[in-house]
Design a protein with these regions (language model features):
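Short, charged cytosolic
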Residues: 1-10, 388-408, 497-508
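Membrane-entry segments of alpha-helical transmembrane domains in multi-pass membrane proteins
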Residues: 27-29, 56-61, 287, 292-295, ...
Length: 608
């Protein structure tokens, strides 16, 4: 057997995420204010002076979608407004007890969770966990938590001399697996790792100090996918295929245009838009200022006391409610309800974060540590990408529908807005299709959402769009925002699937994200995209022909404006299609690939 594909990236070094400078902050705040003013001015004009009276329903539908997007923008601006890093503290046991008034942690358990991952994926995670540097007075123990009860995992744990716990039933998904480990260990602090999470040696050195504050419940560190293909710059690609030099003005202009259209600075780089830098260094880092950075599972470290204290409170309340309803003895109710240190849910990390944040009596805090302390594998197939997006969306929709933190009394209004921004970003499945399909309607029927595509329209519309783009670029510290825009459109079919499942009263239950490249099965994930692209192409052809024939209502401004937006929408949709046949170059010469498992399809099943 040849080496796994990801060994080609072993020498990569993690990025260092610098804080936002005062100048960057001032520019961002100025542009945000301008964008909000321009957006409000545009919407005021849209509602009061631009509605098409001949197609009022269609016109109001479009401007309603625009308004909802603007409200989402306001939420995200609050989300992104400013950084608030928790000052890092070096760990010192004696100083810990002096400042916190509590005994210093004496032990740490490192949990590596696995279900169906290969030995090739899990073994490096164990080796790196063994290399983590710990304080001299700190006992560190590593445990492999196997939800697949596999002999090769038991043998792997034995070979490395680490602890091993297995389960034959999978009650509670990953949260149940973690509970199984928690109930059989005793570490004061618990590090959570997925099967592919490879801790860096300084993980404990750089995170333990935060726990000198006795109210800190967990510390989350960024996810860094070290195997994302680097790709090739557009300039080099143009030179290689067409000629010229990278410094030539036309080459640079063409490269800039291709970057804007595709949302990618390099061709072949990050094919599945997996790079989480914007989420972690922009969103999570800035939520930290309001104690609202939530746990993302892997590469986080937790205080056992906080996790169990919250679980005991919740179980006590649930037992009381059950006893009142069923009028059964307390002992019977206790046996009927499992203790859930991490909430039994497909999004156990987000759910448990909400529950701990709302515990006002305990006053638990979360800390987002902004520097990379672990490396992981990214989705390396369209099936893996779809499984991951389906899991995220299904879990988020389920929480929003059945236990929405917006209505929890003990969360601060700031925390509610931060969590609300997360839910809002998924709820755009309800209004994004309106703006996606509106150009098709106009091109085939000559029905427009505005009175006319006049100079007045462009004077209101262009400032709002341009300032909004500039503000987002400033907010993201120069990180590319195109991938996020592409992802928002490309993932709509997957998010609709998850939304319908939850709407039908089904609980999301999905297979783990495959950790190795998959062969085959990608085409079915882009069938909705291909159908939509065909319909959009047909609409463009109809619009061109009817305009050329001079049909009533068709005009050059209508044609060009809607062709432009249709082209933008088609570019966003088409971005995912080539990925159905993509495999990493390293995997093409190795045996470390998998055929697509049936379980990887992802489905919403009734909760067991």
């Amino acid at each position: 057997m040849t080496r796994p594909y990801f060994t080609a990236y072993e020498t990569r070094k993690p990025p260092v995420f610098a804080p936002m400078s005062a100048r960057q902050r001032a520019i961002w705040h100025f542009l945000a204010g301008c964008a909000v003013a321009a957006g409000a001015y545009y919407l005021q004009w849209r509602w009061s002076a631009s509605l098409n009276a001949d197609a009022l329903g269609f016109s109001m539908l479009v401007v309603g979608a625009e308004t909802l997007f603007f409200l989402g923008t306001l939420l995200f601006y609050f989300d992104f407004w400013d950084e608030g890093d928790t000052p890092p503290r070096p760990y010192d046991g004696a100083a810990f007890e002096a400042t916190s008034g509590a005994p210093a942690p004496q032990s740490v358990d490192i949990f590596i969770t696995t279900y169906d991952e290969d030995v090739a994926v899990v073994a490096p995670s164990i080796s790196d966990a063994k290399a983590v540097i710990a304080p001299e007075d700190m006992r560190v123990q590593i445990w492999l938590l196997d939800d697949g009860d596999r002999a090769d995992m038991a043998q792997l744990a034995k070979h490395h001399g680490i602890g091993y716990f297995a389960r034959r039933e999978n009650l509670g998904f990953k949260a149940g697996n973690l509970r199984n480990g928690l109930l059989r260990t005793s570490g004061d602090l618990v590090v959570i790792c997925d099967a592919d999470t490879r801790l860096l040696p300084g993980f404990l050195q750089n995170t333990l100090g935060y726990f000198s504050d006795p109210q800190v419940a967990w510390v989350q560190t960024p996810h860094w996918f070290y195997d994302v293909p680097p790709g090739e710059s557009w300039s080099d690609w143009i030179v290689r295929h067409i000629g010229g030099t990278p410094a030539h003005r036309l080459v640079r202009l063409a490269a800039a245009v291709l970057t804007w259209i595709t949302g990618r600075g390099r061709i072949g780089a990050d094919p599945f838009l997996a790079d989480p830098t914007v989420f972690f260094d922009v969103i999570q880092r800035r939520r930290n200022r309001n104690n609202a950075a939530f746990c993302c599972g892997a590469a986080s470290i937790h205080r056992r006391e906080a996790v169990f204290a919250g679980a005991i409170k919740r179980k006590s309340a649930a037992v009381g409610r059950l006893q009142t309803r069923l009028r059964q003895p307390v002992a019977t109710c206790l046996r009927a309800l499992p203790l859930q240190p991490y909430r039994f849910h497909v999004s156990e990390d987000l759910y448990t974060s909400i529950l701990l944040h709302e515990d006002a009596a305990a006053g638990w805090k979360s800390v987002y540590h902004p520097q990379v302390e672990a490396r992981m594998l990214s989705p390396m197939s369209l099936t893996a990408w779809a499984a991951q997006r389906l899991k995220y969306a299904g879990g988020t929709f389920d929480i929003a529908a059945h236990d929405n933190p917006i209505f929890r009394r003990c969360l601060s209004w700031r925390q509610k807005l931060h969590y609300g921004a997360t839910f809002w970003s998924y709820l755009n499945v309800l209004w994004a299709p309106i703006l996606l399909l509106a150009p098709m309607v106009s091109l085939t029927t000559a029905v427009t959402p505005v009175k006319a595509y006049s100079l007045d329209f462009f004077m209101h519309f262009l400032p709002a769009v341009v300032l909004g783009e500039l503000a987002m670029l400033a907010a993201c510290k120069g990180y590319p925002v195109g991938p996020g825009r592409v992802l928002g459109v490309a993932a709509l079919p997957v998010h609709w699937h998850a939304f319908i499942c939850v709407l039908r009263g089904q609980k999301p239950r999905f297979a783990p994200t495959p950790k190795l490249p998959l062969v085959g099965g990608g085409l079915r994930h882009v069938l909705p995209h291909l159908v939509l692209l065909a319909l959009m192409s047909g609409a463009a052809a109809v619009g061109i022909v009817r305009t050329a024939l001079g049909h009533t209502g068709f005009s050059a401004p209508l044609l060009w404006v809607n062709l432009f937006w249709l082209g933008v929408n088609m570019t966003l949709i088409a971005r995912l299609v080539p990925m159905a046949w993509w495999t990493p170059p390293e995997a093409r010469q190795t045996e470390e690939t998998q055929t697509e498992p049936e379980a990887a399809h992802g489905a919403c099943q009734l909760a067991n």
